[in-house]
From Swiss-Prot:
<dbReference type="GO" id="GO:0006412">
    <property type="term" value="P:translation"/>
</dbReference>
<comment type="function">
    <text>With S5 and S12 plays an important role in translational accuracy.</text>
</comment>
<protein>
    <recommendedName>
        <fullName>Small ribosomal subunit protein uS4</fullName>
    </recommendedName>
</protein>
<dbReference type="InterPro" id="IPR022801">
    <property type="entry name" value="Ribosomal_uS4"/>
</dbReference>
<dbReference type="GO" id="GO:0003735">
    <property type="term" value="F:structural constituent of ribosome"/>
</dbReference>
<dbReference type="GO" id="GO:0015935">
    <property type="term" value="C:small ribosomal subunit"/>
</dbReference>
<keyword id="KW-0694">RNA-binding</keyword>
<dbReference type="Pfam" id="PF00163">
    <property type="entry name" value="Ribosomal_S4"/>
</dbReference>
<dbReference type="InterPro" id="IPR005709">
    <property type="entry name" value="Ribosomal_uS4_bac-type"/>
</dbReference>
<dbReference type="InterPro" id="IPR001912">
    <property type="entry name" value="Ribosomal_uS4_N"/>
</dbReference>
<comment type="similarity">
    <text>Belongs to the universal ribosomal protein uS4 family.</text>
</comment>
<comment type="function">
    <text>One of the primary rRNA binding proteins, it binds directly to 16S rRNA where it nucleates assembly of the body of the 30S subunit.</text>
</comment>
<keyword id="KW-0687">Ribonucleoprotein</keyword>
<keyword id="KW-0689">Ribosomal protein</keyword>
<dbReference type="GO" id="GO:0042274">
    <property type="term" value="P:ribosomal small subunit biogenesis"/>
</dbReference>
<feature type="domain" description="S4 RNA-binding">
    <location>
        <begin position="96"/>
        <end position="157"/>
    </location>
</feature>
<keyword id="KW-0699">rRNA-binding</keyword>
Length: 206
């Protein structure tokens, strides 16, 4: 299945919220009315059934992290097989993806750009080049930009944007060396309250 490459605004309008798919330097334009669904009948956001609400929440989270349907289903199965709350396990698995960690550290301005950095072999984990965006980063891992890629302007700009919005507490970054430590897997309380993972659990439990 191909990855979506269309307008980012359309996805945010579909979910009715900013999915942070664009960098801070190119935030959603004023003309992108996220309160209005896309399409010719966009003015009518119909009332959703319980199933529809659950499905929309799954799609929202899937799009935030840039994960395809089959991948997302695999993450859910892995989360359900682990001890603890399935929904929290799911979010933690998504947060530990290498492309997401690169984004959290500020090396990429968006998760899509961070995924590209990983795929283009611009990122190392514990000194070894890793080009798999879904690679699971573990607590204590050192994630860095490869030396030959450190002078890229987009990385410097991404780090500046990250410094402006504030970096998450579970990573520690040396912006000059373009290297960081994934200190720990974030707890549910550390993550966005705008996500209702219980709806996703209900959807997959049907």
């Amino acid at each position: 299945m191909a990855r979506y490459i269309g307008p980012k605004c359309k996805l945010s309008r579909r979910e009715g919220t900013d999915l942070f798919l664009k960098s801070g330097a190119r935030a959603l334009e004023s003309k992108c009315n996220i309160e209005t669904p896309p399409g010719v009948h966009g003015q009518r956001r119909g009332r959703l059934s319980d199933y529809g609400t659950q499905l929309r929440e799954k799609q929202k989270v899937r799009r935030i992290y840039g994960v395809l349907e089959r991948q997302f289903s695999g993450y859910y199965k892995e989360a359900a097989s682990r001890k603890g709350a399935t929904g929290e396990n799911l979010l933690q698995l998504l947060e530990c993806r290498l492309d997401n960690v690169v984004y959290r550290m500020g090396f990429g301005s968006t998760r899509a750009e961070s995924r590209q950095l990983v795929s283009h072999k611009s990122i190392t984990v514990n000194g070894q080049t890793v080009n798999i965006p879904s690679y699971q980063v573990k607590a204590g891992d050192v994630v860095a930009v490869r030396e030959k890629c450190r002078n890229q302007l987009r990385i410097a700009q991404a780090l500046e944007l990250c410094a402006q919005r504030g970096r998450v507490e579970w990573v520690e970054v040396d912006a000059d060396k373009k290297s960081g430590v994934f200190k720990n897997v974030p707890a549910r309380s550390d993550l966005s309250a705008d996500i209702n993972e219980n709806l996703i659990v209900e959807l997959y439990s049907k």
